[in-house]
């Protein structure tokens, strides 16, 4: 039977080939303003009924929902917004995760304790005026200083 099974594996259509790929297991954090138990229950039930959701944690004190499962973050956000609540992705990260947390614009009065705003890495544009002044007197370009004099 071993040879017959080996040959039939090439000819048959197996379930493994038809199996669809699932999204990877991920955690989605969403900030939602919830005032009462009814709001919390409504948001929890809407998210819990989504396909692929493993667990839902609601923290009303922080106005935060944490969803674990095989889900698309944008679909979770859209589903939470369908309840009529204003929702956005969680904009805060723990303070110890940032290399330099003392940069301006990082602290927010509404952020929970030990969290700061998620920093955005902004680099200066190539033709910024400060860039031109800094490179004017650099040691790499010796002839630039002579052109001014």
Curated annotation (Swiss-Prot):
Give the residue numbers of the S-farnesyl cysteine lipid attachment: 146
- Where's the HMA domain? 25-88
Q: Does the keyword Cytoplasm apply?
A: no
Return the CDD domains for the record.
Answer: HMA
A Gene Ontology cellular component where this protein is annotated is: membrane
Q: Report the record's Gene Ontology biological process terms.
A: detoxification of cadmium ion
The record's family statement is:
Belongs to the HIPP family.
Q: What does the UniProt entry say about where the protein is found? A: Membrane
Question: What intrachain disulfides are recorded?
Answer: none
PANTHER family under this entry?
COPPER TRANSPORT PROTEIN ATOX1-RELATED, HEAVY METAL-ASSOCIATED ISOPRENYLATED PLANT PROTEIN 21
Q: What is its main location?
A: membrane
Tissues in which the protein is found: Expressed at low levels in leaves and sepals.
Using the record's annotations, give every residue carrying the modification Cysteine methyl ester: 146
**What name appears for this protein in its UniProt entry?**
Heavy metal-associated isoprenylated plant protein 21
Mind telling me which SUPFAM superfamilies this protein's record contains? HMA, heavy metal-associated domain
Q: Which residues form the propeptide?
A: 147-149
**Could you tell me which PROSITE patterns the record lists for this protein?**
HMA_2
Cite the GO molecular-function annotations of the record: metal ion binding
Deletion: any effect? Answer: Hipp20, hipp21 and hipp22 triple mutants are cadmium sensitive.
Q: Which Gene3D superfamilies match?
A: 3.30.70.100
């Amino acid at each position: 039977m071993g040879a017959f099974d080996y040959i039939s594996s090439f000819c048959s259509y197996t379930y493994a080939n038809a199996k669809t790929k699932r999204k990877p297991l991920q955690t989605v954090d969403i900030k939602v303003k919830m005032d009462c138990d009814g709001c919390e229950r409504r948001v929890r039930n809407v998210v819990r009924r989504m396909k692929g959701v493993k667990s839902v944690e609601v923290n009303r004190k922080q106005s935060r929902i944490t969803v674990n499962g095989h889900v698309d973050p944008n679909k979770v956000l859209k589903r939470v917004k369908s309840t009529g609540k204003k929702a956005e992705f969680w904009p805060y990260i723990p303070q110890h995760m940032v290399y330099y947390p003392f940069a301006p614009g990082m602290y927010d009065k509404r952020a929970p304790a030990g969290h700061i705003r998620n920093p955005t890495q902004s680099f200066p544009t190539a033709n910024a005026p400060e860039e031109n002044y800094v490179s004017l007197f650099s040691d790499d370009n010796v002839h630039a200083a002579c052109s001014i004099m």
